[in-house]
Amino acid sequence: MSKQTFTTTFAGKPLVVEVGQVAKQANGATVVRYGDSTVLTATVMSKKMATGDFFPLQVNYEEKMYAAGKFPGGFMKREGRPSTDATLTARLIDRPIRPMFAEGFRNEVQVINTVLSYDENASAPMAAMFGSSLALSISDIPFNGPIAGVQVGYIDGEFIINPDKEQMEASLLELTVAGSKEAINMVESGAKELSEDIMLEALLKGHQAIQELIAFQEQIVAVVGKEKAEVELLQVDADLQADIVAKYNAQLQKAVQVEEKKAREAATEAVKEMVKAEYEERYAEDENLATIMRDVAEILEQMEHAEVRRLITEDKIRPDGRKIDEIRPLDAVVDFLPKVHGSGLFTRGQTQALSVLTLAPMGETQIIDGLAPEYKKRFLHHYNFPQYSVGETGRYGAAGRREIGHGALGERALEQVLPSLEEFPYAIRLVAEVLESNGSSSQASICAGTLALMAGGVPIKAPVAGIAMGLISDGTNYTVLTDIQGLEDHFGDMDFKVAGTREGITALQMDIKIAGITPQILEEALAQAKKARFEILDVIEATIAEPRPELAPTAPKIDTIKIDVDKIKVVIGKGGETIDKIIAETGVKIDIDDEGNVSIYSSDQAAIDRTKEIIAGLVREAKVGEVYHAKVIRIEKFGAFVNLFDKTDALVHISEIAWTRTANVSDVLEVGEDVDVKVIKIDEKGRVDASMKALIPRPPKQEKKEEKHD
């Protein structure tokens, strides 16, 4: 295929697609230019079905530092593991694409997005999402797209599609919404306590904008799209399925209805093992034993899936016996740990999260050096999910994509209520340890984070709670579930997480397993989530009604003083010599920003006070008319030099020592002598003149005696 170019304009920026010039050995490849952002997307598919029981889709978003004209950091000077932003973007693209493959599709698919040039005012992630869908759509990979995504901002009551950097900074909303022509299938959002009505309108505005991008993709596919390949889908043997269902469906249904998680898992596993043992023995000599046993496992999974959904849609009974809109039992505890700066333990049924707060000087902020201009990140929310939380063994190591994503969701939910840097000049870190999990652990970590922040004395604007909503749909009828547990998440159609305060929503995240959901379902889920959120906030506020007025005794105390910008270099000193000396003497930590705000941190108030005294002395300036208790440091013929304070000296001219004539300075003053002086002049070079006689009353003039004449 020779190079073909397709051009349109979207959200005020040129959108150019090039096909047929690069990466021609991939199943499908596109170069998408949006503004000055350029993303290459290449998609490939394995020729055979993978052996696992899941769809092996891998989506990568690779940030090349050359795209922003930057050198990579570190000793190796080349790109290493993906940044947090790159990982989150890869997840953002994966989530709307995954539901668009057929049930039973098991071929491995890779979608690799490479950012080749970066424009901070034209979203590279949205260009990559567009390119991912288009590359799959024009390829021979059986993808049931296209899909597209947009970012939505909200400024002065107006919605803005794909806002630029300046607009996003002013926006009350940072929403990414993706979907197909028919429906929304992915949502990711942070918001400044916006109402459900505004959030719903934003979602619909986003989906409306998506239509333009999908239509553009369809035009391109019509010109350059390949015929889709015939691939084998995972299908079980119909006779085998009928046999197992007839014999064991009743037993499996009974096991699924056991209310307690561990007991239910044991009961269902017992039935499954019994069935597997029977069929393994029956077909022991069959050369297709492996395929048969794979089908047995798949059939049992489908039977469990069908029963969970039947219970909810027909009987309106959930596996643990709850009503459709009922939350599991709640418990909230603060001060679970001594010594730390704040801690909160939140439990919802069999899901439990411990959040631990650490406060630090602003010097501990994380420096983010990616494609965007370098910036400092003050608030960190980290999420850990150990395997013991679900009673299993497993891999331990660096945080995976899921943990990074859940941590970022909690971060977005909580950062909206944090005090400003001026109000609270600390770096803030929350670590969520999931101690037990049966679904919705990310939302439990948000609730625990609220407890830890308030217990630690962080003056948040309002407590935040989170809830996960689910959906069971047969295409015609549907049921929205409140507070989904693991089984409902696994066999359900939607995981819709909503976090916020009593005033409004601070974060949304939605993933679905079906092609999309309607505005009616979204509206119902948001309304149901609001009711649940308020119930959880009642429990949180009953435990701790408001942030404590004082920090924990173990937290660093802080005091801030303001100095003139031109005095910053005085406090720091040559090569940091002065500030290092202060820190060595007092044991404090000191941060100085570019505006002259000096923050002093220590657990010892006396050390803070001493540091303030030292810095005040360093930046103090002599003023005309002020009196100082000075020390003579040098004597010259023309006068004496005195030290007013710290490094500020003044000259007392010989004529300013006394009202009477002084013949020799050394007759009146000596080095080391303390004297009181008054500043009488400061010249344009900062040189100070002082006077001793100005503090002495001027003696009256003596009248000349008249001579007597005889």
Curated annotation (Swiss-Prot):
Domain KH positions: 556-615
PROSITE patterns (UniProt xref): KH_TYPE_1, S1
Any one Gene Ontology BP term: RNA processing
Disulfide bonds listed in the record: none
S1 motif domain: residues covered: 625-693
Keyword annotations of the record: Cytoplasm, Magnesium, Metal-binding, Nucleotidyltransferase, RNA-binding, Transferase
Domain of life: Bacteria
Listed HAMAP family: PNPase (MF_01595)
NCBIfam families according to UniProt: polynuc_phos, PRK11824.1
Protein name: Polyribonucleotide nucleotidyltransferase
Organism: Streptococcus pyogenes serotype M3 (strain ATCC BAA-595 / MGAS315)
